[in-house]
Every structure is written in C-alpha cells, then in structure tokens.
Amino acid sequence: MIKKYALCLLIATAIAGCKKEVTIKTQPKPPVVAPDSVSFTSVKLEAKKNPGIITKDLVCDITDDQITAVIPQMEKLSKKLVVTFTTQNSTVTKNDTLQVSGKTAVDLRKPVTYTLTSAKGTTRNYRFTVKVFTGIPVLYLTTNGPVVSKDDYVTGKVDVDPNNSFEQEKLSIPLKIKGRGNSTWSEFPKKPYRLKFNDKAAMLGMPAAKNWVLLANYDDKTLMRTRIAFEFARRIGSDFAPQSRFVEVVMNGKFLGNYLLTSQVEVHENRVNITEMTENDNSGDALTGGYLLELDQRKDEKFWFVTKKNLPFTLKSPEETTPAQLKYIKKYIQDTEDALFADNANDPVNGYAKYIDVNSFMNWFFVEEVVKNQDARDFSSIFYYKERKGKLHMGPVWDFDLSSGNVDYSPAKDPKSWYIRDATWMVRLFKDVAFRSKVKKRWNEIRSTAVEAIFKDIDDNAAYLKLSQQQNFSKWPILDKYVWPNAVVLGNYDLEVAYAKDFLMQRIAWIDAEIATY
C-alpha cells in the first residue's frame, strides 16, 4: 500500500514539473491626479481685527459661491472690514488686487466679488455679502409728531436700508403716516401703519406706488401667516395677489419689531389693475367699471349697500361714487346673487356664470379654504372687482393673521372641516355638480406644486426670520403669553411654526380626501 501511494506521488510531481511557468503581468495604475479645485475653507470677521464694529468673532456662512455675514448692529456699515480667511490651493483677489487674510480692509457696504486662483490658473468667484442687525431690510421712519390716530396723517420720511437684499433706487422718501386696522390697532401695543408717499416709489423690488401698509402681525407668533398665504395666492394665479417683504421697523430711533411691508388694496396699475373711474363715467360702457368692492360687516365706508341675503358690500373705488355708479354696481351685485339662487342657477349661459368669473372665484376659494381664514367667511377683507364690460371677480386676498389654526373661538380652529365653502355664495356654488367638477380638476392641478410648496415656504421663512424673530420677541416678550385669539400658547417660536405647519398638513390631507369624493 505504501509503495502504491509513493508511486502516485512520484507521478503527480512529474506532471507538475512538466507545466510551463506562467507569469501574469499587471498594468500599472495611472497616478491619481488631484483635481485643480479652489475654494474658501473658512471666512470670518474677527473682533480684534475690527474694533468698534464687532464685539465678537463672526463666522461667515459659505453656501455654494455665496459668503454671507450678519453683523448684529442696527446701524449701517460706515467702516471697512478686515476679513480673515483660509483657502484651498489658491490666492485671493478683488478687482485684481491681492487680498491678505487678516490684513486687507474691504468696503463691504455693498456685496463684493472675491476671485480665487490656483497655481495652475483655475479660478472661482465668490460673492461676499455683509448684512446688519437681523439680515433683513430696515425701514427708519422719522415723523414730525407721534402717530396716534387712524384718521390723521403725520408727515415725515422713511429711510430705506435694503440690507444688500433688494434693489432700492430711492433711499429716502418723504411721506405721511397714520395708523390702520381695527382690533389690531385698538387692542395691541405693536401697531400697524399706513404709509402714503409724496410721490410713487418702488420698495424693495416691488413696483412703484404711493400707498403702502406695514402689518404688525402681533397676534400671529409665526409672523408669517399672511406672507405664506400671499405667496400661495401668487403661485396659483389668484387675482392681483399682493407682493410683500419682511422688514424691521425703527420709528424715531425706537425699534418696533418685525413687520410685513405690503401693498394697499387699491385700483392702481401695479395693484388692482382695472379702469379707474371718474365722476363722468355715468352711462354706457363707462358705467360698467371698474369697481372695487369689499364684503365687510363693519359697513364703515362712505358708500355701502346690503343684498337680499344680508351681505354688506362697501365700495372702495371709485372713492367719490356718483348716484348712477352706486345704482349700477348695487344692481349688478344683486343680479349676481339672484342668479346664484335662481332655479336655473347652474345654466352655463343664463345662470351665475353669466355674472361671475368662475376661475377667479375658485382660486380665491382655495387660498382662503386651505389656510381656513377666520374672517373670509362673509365677515371682512373679502374683495371683489368688476372691470369695464367684464364679469365679477374675487380678489385680491387679504388679512391672514387669523388663519392656519390661529383662532380659538370658531370652527376655523379645526383643520378637518369645511369653512369657506359654507359662506353664503360659496355654499350655493358647491351645489352645482359642474362647479364641483371644476374644483376637483383645479385642485389636482395645483396639489403637487403650489399646495405642496407651502411647506417649503414655511421652512424657508422660518430660517430667514431666525434673527428677526429673536429681536421681535425680545421687544415683545409674548411667546409664553396668550394673545387674543391664539388657539395655543407654546412659549417658543419654533413650536409656533411647527404648530401652523402641522395644522396645514392635517388640513390639506383632509381636503384631499373630501375632494376625492367629488
């Protein structure tokens, strides 16, 4: 047996020895060449390099090709700043002048461009922007007396610091100012204001006009409910939806807090752009428009009337309405209401569609219903307009401080029920199968785009207002206090924002389910 195994081993060895030795050659890997990239790795403003301007080191934000710093002083920059930085593989120049970290002083009152260049010639540009205080624009109001009335204007001026955020041609604007609002003026210490410029002026990228509004948002602790609704309205094409900008307001040297600067609701080429009537427009086509009306239970305008369904309409424009004009628009509104409640209301030719622009009514409805706006169910700030030879439209939307769950005394506090749909005219429209079908189609068109964008808007605005809300609630320490008619008191700004966002998430999901049944 041993001989047998030995023989097998001998044979195997012989066979192995007969094989040709094979050498496998591998190709050498090419050397890894590092990309010739250049970048800032850090940028900061050191207190010791900038005495009298900043009191502690500020680390600048670097996002893509943008560098941003916010200096917590309210005054505009008046001195150059020394910038301290580190880079990857590069030298830094500004307008072909070498910049030395921690030594070169730079005028940063306006954004500057830094150019980084590598040894091999690769370049990259960064835009460096320095803002002051909270980073948002500041309005410095100077008045020739205290502003204590909604009726009497006080003369003065506004100096505008766009804070390197918007283009602003006129930086100092003569004006008149007075109070505005109803409960927001009478009940709250942070007051809203109406501004009337001596001459038309553009504001922070918004088209030129004379009349502007500063909304205080005192009872809206997110500070953004109105802004969110305005932007939603603009995205879905709601008629003449207002533009707006967050601003800090300083009046006569006193900081008043965060405000929303927006347009006055008025007939104007950059606002409600319809024909402006005169006292001579009393017959023919000229008598048919344009009219701007508000459904307002307060009935505190010079010209107003009440329909058979007890809806009070006030006439906003023309301001000096002639008897013929008042008679015409009163009849048109009543004819509209009669058509809505007639037996043939759903007739596409002779029913309500003869009098109203259905798409305009739908877009207005979606804005108000999604955020469940307390006052928009037959109470106030419900605007209509009628252009010359045109139908009745709804808009612009307005007044959203009591929306998105910010009310404790009505069904508007519940995210899971209809509210605007039950208004006098709307409830009748929704009885029409054809109208409900259009509502469903329109909802499906905007649901994944404009509606979904609301949540990103909330997040973006919360980030944008991070420093502003801190200053606002330092001035007005109410986060842990009940302010009429808050549904919740959460004691924290982030929780207030989360509450509003959650309300809208629940609400939109509920609307999804309801409209799916149409």
Ranges and model annotations:
Residues 14-17:
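C-terminal motif of bacterial Sec signal peptides marking the signal peptidase cleavage site
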Residues 1-5, 19-20:
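Positively charged n-region of N-terminal signal peptides that target proteins for export
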Residues 19-136, 141:
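Beta-rich interaction/scaffold domains
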Residues 90-94, 236-248:
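Short, well-structured beta-strand/strand-turn elements
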Residues 156-216:
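Conserved oxyanion/phosphate-binding beta-strand-loop segments in alpha/beta enzyme cores
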